[in-house]
Amino acid sequence: MLAPVRTVAPATMPVSLSEAKAHLRVDHDDQDDLISAQIRAATAWLDGWSGILGRALITQTWRQEFGRFADHLPLPLAPVTAIDSVSYFDAGNVQQTLDTGVYDLFADARGAYVTRRSGQSWPATFRRADAVSIIFTAGYGAAADVPEPIRQAILLIVQRLFDGADTSIDAAIEHTVHALIAPYRKSLI
């Protein structure tokens, strides 16, 4: 399994500039660029395959590649909302798209995965690291659909970045952020 690649980034951030400014009690536009950058930084820390949550926050598209078909083809993000396509390199090294009637999307305690339907079989593939490619959509949807604890964690991170270093509040904010995101962290079973 190769590292996943985001092919379509989210259209928006989970927290808007106006929401962050209201949280920070900032009523001028002088620091909009700074606050926007801090929203992006806080979101990047949480979002996507490399984010601490291992989740897609806003709807986005990813590609996961495998060296071959298997009973379970795990997808590394949650929540997965759709399989857009499954393609493969056939025995002659020609890329083909698999019919949607051959596979299903399921999720268990370990996360989402693609498996073949009963009575179906996987086609033979050419031997290469990217023999099978799954394009999938993941994310909660729009910003308003992101769970509120995650949105609040982003606002607290932005607040911490905006206020600068103050060791007396750092520990409290860090503890609160981790408490807010704990239920959403992808657990390894």
Question: Where on the chain are the PLM-derived regions?
Answer:
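Divalent metal-cofactor coordination and adjacent catalytic microenvironments
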Residues: 1-189
